[in-house]
């Protein structure tokens, strides 16, 4: 009986954490913990369904609650001048790549993209949408595509530029956070 329980436990661990995807890089976790350790500035949201985590500026934004689907959260400024959204999804087609996800994001209407950068496992877009600035970062890891997007009025650019760096540095996917 003990052998069966042990075997079942090993099978569950192997299924939940495939070899090569056991954890986020130490550098990524260190960056996340570094931002989240600044508790007077940042709150840390962890999405247990998709296993991603995001630091959010708690002096500027308030959480509005996780979506009914459990895929993400919205944080908004009390005056409505800024909003941070994050969401995740399982990569149901393992062939989907960052270039494909980037093309899909670029196809969204009404946006003027002024900056884009793509690498093997992430992309960044920023630009303008009507009278607002947007910054989107998507990461692909462990079979999950996670995205955050910060939008804010142009007059808030100086305030939010350093915040974007912190949010980006601490945005990670790690099976230790959930992946249900």
Predicted features by range, described:
Residues 1-7:
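Bacterial N-terminal signal peptides that target proteins for export
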Residues 57, 95, 99, 161-168:
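Extracytoplasmic/secreted envelope proteins and their assembly/folding machinery
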Residues 34-37, 45, 62-66, 111-117, ...:
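Short, exposed beta-strand/loop patches in secreted or surface proteins that constitute
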Residues 24-44:
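N-terminal low-complexity, Pro/Thr/Ser-rich intrinsically disordered segments
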Residues 8-18:
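Bacterial N-terminal signal peptides
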Residues 46-97, 125-128:
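Secretory pathway targeting signatures of secreted, lumenal, and periplasmic proteins
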Residues 99-159, 178:
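Signature of long, low-cysteine stretches enriched in small and polar/charged residues
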Residues 171-179:
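Short, low-complexity, Pro/Ser/Thr/Gly-rich segments in the mature regions of secreted, periplasmic
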């Amino acid at each position: 009986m003990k052998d069966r329980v042990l075997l079942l436990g090993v099978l569950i661990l192997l299924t939940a954490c495939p070899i090569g995807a056991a954890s986020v890089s130490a550098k990524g976790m260190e960056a996340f913990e570094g931002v989240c350790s600044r508790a007077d500035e940042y709150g840390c949201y962890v999405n247990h369904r998709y296993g991603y985590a995001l630091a959010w500026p708690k002096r500027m934004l308030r959480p509005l609650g996780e979506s009914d689907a459990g895929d993400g959260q919205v944080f908004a400024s009390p005056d409505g001048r800024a909003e941070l959204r994050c969401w995740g999804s399982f990569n149901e087609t393992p062939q989907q790549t960052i270039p494909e996800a980037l093309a899909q994001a670029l196809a969204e209407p009404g946006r003027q993209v002024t900056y884009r950068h793509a690498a093997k496992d992430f992309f960044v877009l920023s630009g303008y949408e009507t009278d607002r600035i947007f910054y989107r970062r998507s990461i692909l890891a462990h079979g999950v595509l996670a995205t955050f997007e910060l939008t804010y009025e142009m007059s808030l650019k100086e305030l939010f530029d350093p915040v974007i760096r912190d949010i980006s540095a601490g945005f990670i996917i790690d099976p230790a956070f959930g992946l249900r």
